[in-house]
Amino acid sequence: MLSKTIAAAVQGIDATMVTIETTFDWGTQIVIVGLPDTAVKESTERVKCAINEAGFTFPNKTVVVNMSPADIKKEGAAYDLPIAIGTLASDEVVPADRLSKYMIMGELGLDGSVRKIKGALPMAILARELHLEGFILPKENASEAAIVNNLKVYGVDHISQVVQLLNGEQPLEPTVIDTRAEFAKAQGNFPFDFSDVKGQDNVKRAFEVACAGGHNILLIGSPGSGKSMMAKRLPSILPPLSLAEALETTKIHSVAGSLKSGTTLLTTRPYRAPHHTISQVALVGGGTYPTPGEISLAHNGVLFLDELPEFNRNVLEVMRQPLEDRQITISRAKYSTLYPASFMLVASMNPCPCGYYGHPSKPCVCSPYQRQHYLSKISGPLLDRIDLQIEVQPVNFEELADKTPGESSESIRQRVIQARALQNMRFQNTPGIHCNAQMTTAMLHQWAEPDSEGVELLRNAIERMNMSARAYDRILKVARTIADLEASVSVRASHIMEAIGYRSLDRGNYFTF
């Protein structure tokens, strides 16, 4: 008897329907066709053992499994459960006509237990789009999938529960999640606050500007000046995720398999801080079977690269295209996979190998060549893509001893939210543009044209600092953000002056010996 089970394959961060057809033939083996990978082919023994251990009898026939469409690669062990249920349906253990109402996914243990899978959220979204009655999947993934409304999500621990559900012997209660309540519940819970930071008012201001416009920022300072400490507090002043952003962010982490069991919705912006030994594939994504990298896991959030010159230069260079396009395409011989990568880059570095160039009390022991060589590890095109380049000076004793708390993250965040609200109104009719950092050159002429005094100031700066055309655009974007923080309709000379002050590495005299 032919049975058809509905499953899914994840491509990028979206799912595609896969139909698993099962029937019997002469012999005693399992044959799987339809472009399965090694893990799917190995499911034959897992399926056979799981069915027998669950108290059912595996058919003493050849089981032929066809996974269509045949041109889509089926990867991973998540097809164990639908193959097993399809086999039981062909053997009339469960009614085959019931299978058309459900999507079924899950990895099987040899004892029939159902184990966690990757990509449950995009699969659940697909199941709703197909107007299916429900989605049967591992219990560990149930909360994640249940944020999709108008879909019954059944979390199971064992294959026998699926059989009982399909036979109507023991109905399961679907997992129910109030998506909007979950979204609102965890908003604003941050472990770090800017009120803990002593001094560094200029750096706090730079962070405020960066968050208000979604700009990339580089911190340059000696060890112990507070670069990493302040970077950890950056998420606390970013504007909250919208529900659409939260769903998209959760989808990426679902595909990567990085969601913890019981997680429903990611409600705070991601903060990723990979070590400087990271590989290209781990940073931008890829592999034999492409998975999202750190730049995609930081989508709608922050990617913090500490000690930037210590990263492999080739690893840093692969970020250039995603920083511009805010997405990354992983190409293989027969297909391409697209992952979102709209993140805010926050990087830090020492000014020289010893770390003390420009320190007020500790002398630098590096030669001029060593300083220039250290900085040259970061290419000019990459530096051009970093809007704000800030020098971080050590905090003096008086500031450290001051018991007065600094300005709280919440008060800074409110100013950031107000500036973002202006940008949301500005770009409401421009799909894909949400903040000033994403503006095109044409938009700069429309929204960031400075007054006559600002134009003259900008001309002098460009000529003296020998800036690139990209750096010129970055200054205008930052100036527009500064104007938004002041609720100013126009970009004035004072805004241009502050934006130029955030281009430390563009100054021809940065390393003066």
Predicted feature residues:
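Peripheral, non-AAA+ core regions of ATP-driven protein-machinery
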Residues: 1-218, 222-228, 331, 471-472, ...
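Residues immediately C-terminal
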Residues: 110, 303-304, 310-311
